Amino acid sequence: MSFIDPYQHIVVEHQYSHVFTVTVRKATNVTKGAIGDMLDTPDPYVELFIPSAPDCRKRTKHFNNDVNPVWNETFEFILDPNQDNVLEVTLMDANYVMDETLGMATFPISSLKLGEKKEVQLTFNNVTEMTLELSLEVCSSTDLRFSMALCDEEKKFRQQRKDNIMQSMKSFLGEENSKNLTTSRDVPVIAVLGSGGGFRAMVGFAGVMKALYESGVLDCATYIAGLSGSTWYMSTLYSHPDFPEKGPKEINQELMNSVSHNPLLLLTPQKVKRYIEALWNKKSSGQPVTFTDIFGMLIGETLIHNRMDTTLSDMKEKVSEAQCALPLFTCLHVKPDVSELMFADWVEFSPYEIGMAKYGTFMSPDLFGSKFFMGTVVKKYSENPLHFLMGVWGSAFSILFNRVLGVSNSQNKGPTMEEELENIRLKHLVSNDSSDSEDESQHPKGTENSEANEEYQNSSQESWVQRMLMALVGDSALFNTREGRAGKVHNFMLGLNLNSCYPLSPLADLLTQESVEEDELDAAVADPDEFERIYEPLDVKSKKIHIVDSGLTFNLPYPLILRPQRGVDLIISFDFSARPSDSSPPFKEILLAEKWAKMNKLPFPKIDPNVFDREGLKECYVFKPKDTSSEKDCPTIIHFVLANINFRKYKAPGLPRESKEEKDFADFDIFDDPNTPFSTFNFQYPNEAFKRLHDLMEFNTLNNLDVIKQAMMESIEYRKENPSRCSVSLSSVEARRFFNKNNLNNHT
C-alpha cells in the first residue's frame, strides 16, 4: 500500500503448536491368539489415540484376512508442546458386530526431538511387530491471522473504494460544494449503520437503502454495517445475483412478496423433513447443532429461498472492484451464566474475514465453524451457508421462538414480547452444558466396521428424526430452553495462550483523546451491571462457544465501525429499535453504544439526551465532537430514528399529500398502534404494512439529504486538515495490553 499502517507493527502474541506426523507402515504376524487364529483370520486395522490432542483419534483402513498388512498411511496431529503428549497405538480386528482389541502399546512423544524423523518398532503380545515412522515439527504457519491491522484485502478495497467514491461524491455534492475534494486522500470514510428490530428493521432498512442508492449517497459510503434484522436485508441485497446492476427498488419488490406469507407455511411436513436431514448431516459430521440452525433455515427460506447454498465468501464478487460498500455483520460471543449486558465479545463478519478484534484473531469465512487448535485447523468443514449466519445474527428471535410463532398460551397474561426480549439482556442466556466435553476421546473402540457403522447410523438417524419431530411440537430442550436455541460453533481460539488481550483502540494512549470522567462511565443506561465484565478474556479451554444476536447487549453495530483502523469520519445511523411509544425518547441504544465506546477508549461524540426535551421528536439528530482540535479522531453521527412526522403530510420531500387515500396511507403509528403491525416479533408483513414502513424510511432519508450533504462537506474539510487519522510515529508503537494474567484483577 502507499501508506504505512502502524497497527501492523503491533505484535499479537501467540504460541506455535507442534505437528506430530505418524506413518503406519506395516505389521507382521498379526494374531488373535492360538485359539482365535484357528477360528478366524484377523482383519487388522490400527487406531491412533493422543488424549491431549483436539482431533485425538485416527485409524487406518482394515484388510480382510491378512496377517501381514501393509498400510503406508500417514496421519497428522496438532499438539500443545506444553502438554504431556503420549501416543497410544491399538491393533484392532474388524468384526461385523463388535471389533476386537488385539493389543495396545504407547510411545512418549516428548522423547522425539524437533525436526527428527524416527522409525519405531512396536511389539504386541510378544509376537506381532508393527513399524511406525514418527516426526515432530514446529507448526510455523497458522490458519488464524494474528494482527490488530485490517487484512490486506480490506486495505486494497479501501484504496480502490476511495478512488471510486471521489467521482461519486463530486456528483452528489455538486461542483461548488466539492471544490475542496482534490485528491482521493481528501475522501472521508463514511459508514451506514442499521440496527436490529426483526422484520421491522429489515423493511425499514430496505426503504433506507433505496433512498441512499437512488440519491447517490450509497456510492459515497465505504462501509455498511448491520445487526440482527438489518443484516437480513443486507444478506438479501448482497446475495442477489443482479445487485448492484439491479437496485433496491426491484429487489425490495421481491422482498415484499417474500414476507407477505405466513411463516408457519415453512413448517410443512415436506420442508420439516428437509430441515431435519440437513441438521442430521451437520450433527453427524461432528458440528454442534442448536435451534439457531433451524431458525436460519426458516429465515433463509423466507428471504433467499432460491439461493440457499450461497455463502458469505460469495459476496466477495460484489466488492471485487470496490463497486459496492463493504458489508459488515456482527454477533456476540457470550459466556455461560453471565448476562450479555455484563460480558460479550463482538464478532465481526465481512466477505474477507471473520474474527474478534479484542483478541486480534481473524480467519477466512470458509473456516468459521471448523475445529481449531492453537490457531490451526484440525478438522475443516464446508463453509456454513449464509442462512446459518442469518440465523446467528438474528438469534434473539430463535431464543423466543414460541413467541415468534404465536404458539404460547393465549391466556397467559405475562410480559409482552418486547418486554421479554428486553429481559433477556438482564439474564444470562446460556449455562455450562455437558455437551462441551464431548470429544472423540469418548467414542468407544470397535465401532469402525463400515457395515455395522452404517446400520448404527441408520438407526441413530431414525431415532434422532423422531426426537426432532417431537421437538417441533414442543417436547425437547432443543426448542424449549433458551440455551438450546442459542447458536454454537467450535471454539476457534481453543488452546491459544491468552496472556494478553488488546484494546479496540490499541494506540489510544498515544493519540489525543477526550478525557473521560469516571462517574460518566459509572452512569447506568439500561442496567447497573452493564458492561461490568467486558475486559475479561474468552475461555480458551472451552471446546465450543455460544454466539448470539448482538442486539442482546445493545442494538446498534457501532463496535464494527469504531475500530480506529477503519478511520470512519461520518456515521449515518438508522435505529429501528422498539420504544414504549411513538413519543418516547429514541436514544437508549446510542447511549449504550456511547458508554461502550468510552469504556474501550474509542472516540465518540457526546450524546445529549436532553436534545429531545429541547427539540422534540425529529427524523434525525446530528451529534458532533465539541472540539475537533482535541477530538480529531471523533466521528460525526447522523442518527435517524423511527418516527412518522413529515411523512404524514408529504408523499415526497416538498410534495404535499392531496387525496384522502394518500393521507390515510400515511396516517399510522409505529409503536402506539394497538394491532402492533410493526412488532419486533411480526414475521408477516401484508403489502400495505410493508409499503408504509418502507416508504416512511425512504422519505425520512430523502427529506434529510441536506443534513447528509452538510456533514459530508464538513468531513471533507476535516480530512483535508487531518490527512492521517493515526498521527503516531512507528518508533513509539508497542503492544498495548488490555490485561494480562498478572494484573487482570486491576481491570475488573
UniProtKB/Swiss-Prot annotation:
It catalyses: a 1,2-diacyl-sn-glycero-3-phosphocholine + H2O = a 1-acyl-sn-glycero-3-phosphocholine + a fatty acid + H(+); a 1-acyl-sn-glycero-3-phosphocholine + H2O = sn-glycerol 3-phosphocholine + a fatty acid + H(+). Residues 449-459 have a biased composition (Polar residues). The active site is at 228 (nucleophile), 549 (proton acceptor). Keywords: Calcium, Cytoplasm, Cytoplasmic vesicle, Hydrolase, Lipid degradation, Lipid metabolism, Metal-binding, Phosphoprotein. Ca(2+) 1 binds at residues 40-41, 43, 65. SUPFAM superfamilies: C2 domain (Calcium/lipid-binding domain, CaLB) (SSF49562), FabD/lysophospholipase-like (SSF52151). GO terms for biological process: arachidonate metabolic process; arachidonate secretion; cellular response to antibiotic; establishment of localization in cell; glycerophospholipid catabolic process; leukotriene biosynthetic process; monoacylglycerol biosynthetic process; phosphatidylcholine acyl-chain remodeling. Stimulated by agonists such as ATP, EGF, thrombin and bradykinin as well as by cytosolic Ca(2+). Residues 431-459 are annotated as: Disordered. SMART domains: C2, PLAc. Activated by phosphorylation on a serine residue. It is found in: Cytoplasm; Cytoplasmic vesicle. Ca(2+) 2 binds at residues 40, 43, 93-95. Residues 6-124 form the C2 domain. It is an enzyme of class 3 (hydrolase). Residues 138-740 form the PLA2c domain. Its main location: cytoplasm. One of its GO terms (cellular component) is Golgi membrane. CDD domains: C2_cPLA2 (cd04036), cPLA2_Grp-IVA (cd07200). The modification Phosphoserine is found at residue 505. The N-terminal C2 domain associates with lipid membranes upon calcium binding. It modulates enzyme activity by presenting the active site to its substrate in response to elevations of cytosolic Ca(2+). Selectively hydrolyzes arachidonyl phospholipids in the sn-2 position releasing arachidonic acid. Together with its lysophospholipid activity, it is implicated in the initiation of the inflammatory response. This is Cytosolic phospholipase A2.
